[in-house]
Amino acid sequence: MVVPPWYELPPPGYGGLEQVCSALVDGLAAKGHEVTLFGAGTGTGTAAHFVGTDPELQHHRLGQTLPELAHLTRVNRMISPESFDIVHDHTTVGPYATDRPVPTIATVHGKPTGELREVLADVDPKVGLVAISHTQRRLAPELPWVATVHNGISTGNLVTKSAPGMGPVLWLARFSADKGPDLAIEACRAAGLPLVLAGKCDERSERRYLEQVVEPMLGPDVTVLRNPDRDATVRLLLAARCLIMPIRWEEPFGMVMVEAMATGTPVVALNRGAVPELIRSGETGLICDDPSELGPALREVSRLDPGVCAAHVRREFSAERMAEDYERVYRAFVEPGLEPPVRPASAPTVAW
């Protein structure tokens, strides 16, 4: 398995892709697969055999092309058909790894529009693209998709609340207009409820948005927490009345919604992106078509059963389910035309 050189697995705080990859690595290892994880840094937090292409995480170069290309070049030097049966790539440049001597699938984690859509449209058919939601796939149906696999989360050690949370409404994301923290403030004030804005605020654009847009709106009813770690995030979710997801973009997935429901916390969200694929409105949350509906929904959502929310995640978005789905993709891609067995007698070796 190949991950970008700037991500730590599992993540110490915010990080949807990192959570997914960690859960998948551990899920595959639990099923008996030998998994090698190619990344940067020390990589000691998963069940995979870790191979680092750089001794230091490249988080200070996040989004730059050259470090990811260098990472991919080093990975390709270490991949051979004698060592691996399939490569699963999560990098942006992974879909262009056409010279690998081992079959490669690449999960697309971003929104496949604009320049990314143009790039992916030119991918060699020897590389299979996997979508993380039907919504994402519909945004670019002409791309060479081979499967759609919903992201999953490790649920084994998660604590689930037994009764609805009585704390503030929680917004948990990176500080940007797309994530709608300003809409969260307006909705909570309309409902007369306190709000916690807990989010990633590392990059210059995130800090600028917080300072210029969010901070002028703050009052005693809104608390801001920058970059909470994993333990703090879980505590916030367990205490929260609900998670609010007032997104303004066609988000391909939204891992935070799954994480919230896993703790028994329902989600109030705008009907954008993959929201209707993840939430069962009226059971695990409430989906609103317009921002004006968010306030009333925040008042109503406390009637939902935390146990139903958690059971929904265990059934539909567990790491085990994700690993099983990817097993089918691997086998179908390695042996086209063959129906992959549900429980293979011998497990292939997977390079992440």
Give the ranges of each region predicted by the language model.
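Catalytic cores of nucleotide-sugar-dependent glycosyltransferases that transfer UDP/GDP/TDP-activated
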Residues: 1-352
